[in-house]
């Protein structure tokens, strides 16, 4: 960071307005343009991800304490803590309507299969109340909130004990009443993660044990499209040159390569081809786009 502060053990990023939030051993708030540190909050055992909620507050999941901690972004302090269950390892947090949806991520040794909700407002009254619990697939790993809440579950993937493996799965959930609309096992796919959606809402992409997959939103046509092992994947829309006189817009995937540390690939979905390779010093842990 620009004011000589080191981020200890960075794990995830969230770009939100003029801020870039970084979760590491602590929670860090920075200016997205200058990367100047604006605030820092400690008090976590194993912080994982964050989400910004109304009234200038943030939720941060703490995997080892099986809780979500509420941060006041005015004075950068933890003001409450919401338990998510015993040994649940909460991770990803996404917002929809008046709630945050928390994925209890589990792991290969102690898997979890739950999604919990925390209601953060009632009209204009700020809240932070546990409000629901839903059993879904093994080890929920990522989600998008287009229309319903769409959750990808990693299953169990252990290369040294393949007999213990459990296939990944997908759940489409009504956000208002926390009921499952439909679910789908992903045959032959393990360790699915990093669910992203195209801008037209027609397709998802996600990472898995043997590469990056594309699917329609009903999960009825799932195909391996990029055979690169990756654990960082994000999507954005950019303009590109079709020829000397014509430009077009496409979704672009950005992904790391687990077999080539520090390598980031850029993939044009319209062209179904890689268009750039970016090299950085060090391991790529997460990727966020400035709005």
PLM region spans:
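A short beta-strand motif characteristic of beta-propeller blades
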Residues: 1-6, 34-42, 77-83, 122-133, ...
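Post-signal peptide N-terminal segment of secreted/secretory-pathway proteins
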Residues: 1-52
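Solenoidal tandem-repeat scaffolds enriched in leucines and small polar residues
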Residues: 77-171
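Blade-level signature of beta-propeller repeat domains, shared across WD40, Kelch, NHL, RCC1
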Residues: 258-291
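Conserved beta-strand positions in repeat-built beta-propeller and related beta-rich domains
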Residues: 14-26, 60-64, 102-110, 151-164, ...
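Repeated scaffold domains used in trafficking and secretory/extracellular systems
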Residues: 7-16, 45-55, 86-95, 133-146, ...
